[in-house]
Amino acid sequence: MVGAVIVGAGEGKRMGASGRKQFVKIAGKPIIAYTLDVFERSPLIDHMVIVVPLDSIDWVKEDVVATYGMKKVHAVVYGGATRQESVMNGLKALKPGTQRVVIHDAVRPIVSDTLIRRVLDAAQKTGAAITAVPARDTVKRVESGEIVGTMDRRLLWLAQTPQSFRYDLLMNAHTKAVADKIEGTDDASLAERIGTKVMVAVGSYSNIKMTSPEDLPMFEYFLGQDVKARLDSAVDQGPRGAARGDTRGEARGRQRHRRRRPHRRSARKPEAGHARPSEAPRQRHPKEMKGAHHRDGVRHS
């Protein structure tokens, strides 16, 4: 059984006056609802637990789960003081017998079933996997406003969610982190510190995390472009193409489309005695008429 924990307990301070980012409405629908839709439709996910602030539980149950018909939602639970605590609360609320879990940020609404499948497949090897993309920009180490080093970009990947783990492995990682008073930046870091090899599944640059007001117009644009369909098409290029951020597959598709000849309708023969709509009947010369047979088989003299 595969369960998903959708983490949306953050206060969204960087979102400013817009309020908690996971509940901001785009085209009349909360961001968290777009995210849940993907997991609701995915045949890979059996059930979900949503983690939100305590004072938002009833609103989420009524205005999100009930309004949008989320049948896979098993529970809506409150989050903790940190993301790590929130994930732990979500893990405890999953159905008994859950063997694998997918952790996902509620504010990454441009996730796709393809990414969920990819991270689940990658986690089969060691019990742990994340989605990530290669760094595109040069990364600097800075101290007190001064560059103290330049990182090798070829070795750097930007971690995303969804992340997938064997349930018992992730519970063990979280339990040990609490005992050791360790605060991890993501679930993979907790798995790493107990010696787990965490695999990487190629993510998507479109799988953005909505953290500030500047991200909202970007999501609105993606929404207008039907980004989920385009994302599924793009990531289906496979790890090599996606790792390069390669869009040549789309370009080739457009070229094939341009080269494709338009369908020609076959010309219909006009019936006897009727001319084509765009043509006047041709006047036949008397010599042509002599001895000719009309289409109706009557001989003319």
Predicted regions and their residues:
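Short aromatic/basic micro-patch
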Residues: 25, 110, 150, 164, ...
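Conserved beta-loop-beta/alpha segment of the NTase-like Rossmann-fold superfamily
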Residues: 73-75, 81-144, 160
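Conserved N-terminal catalytic core of the sugar/cofactor nucleotidyltransferase
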Residues: 33-98, 178
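Targeting/processing segments of secretory and organellar proteins
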Residues: 290-292, 296-299
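Conserved alpha/beta core of the MobA/IspD/sugar-nucleotide pyrophosphorylase nucleotidyltransferase superfamily
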Residues: 157-246, 250, 257-258, 263, ...
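N-terminal glycine-rich phosphate-binding loop and ensuing alpha1 helix
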Residues: 1-58
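Residue-level signal for inorganic ion chemistry
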Residues: 6, 32, 90, 104-105, ...
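A recurrent flexible, glycine/aromatic-enriched loop bordering the glycosyltransferase active site
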Residues: 149-159
